[in-house]
């Protein structure tokens, strides 16, 4: 039953996305371009509660899907903190076992994203584009906070 639901959900998501107004937030594409152009030590991954197929449908709609080399998705585990562990394992498969947790940066817009990073000893950049303001996100222990990704350069992120 669950797989049938997600199959139907993903189908309708693909049908309806072109009919709704949505945009890639300012700064996202610039940062993705900067990180992609960076040396091989920077690898982009996606950690989301969406299923892999739903994430693919959403990101393809905005021409972002091909930017990420690895990921952890809602169909990998229902607990966001476990997704962080899965993403870390997958990153080590791509980069190598020498990857340290503190070299991982999770960018998100909720206290749960900050907690997710903390659960594996990673850094976090909290972006106040969702339902939480910068002060709330900073108080959760984010390594850094910005109002929007357009407010920070790739080099600054790499120094976090």
What are these regions (language model features)?
Residues 25-28, 48-51, 110, 130, ...:
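Helix N-cap/beta->alpha junction signal
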Residues 72-79, 128-132, 149-152:
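Short, acidic/turn-prone active-site loops that include or flank metal/cofactor-
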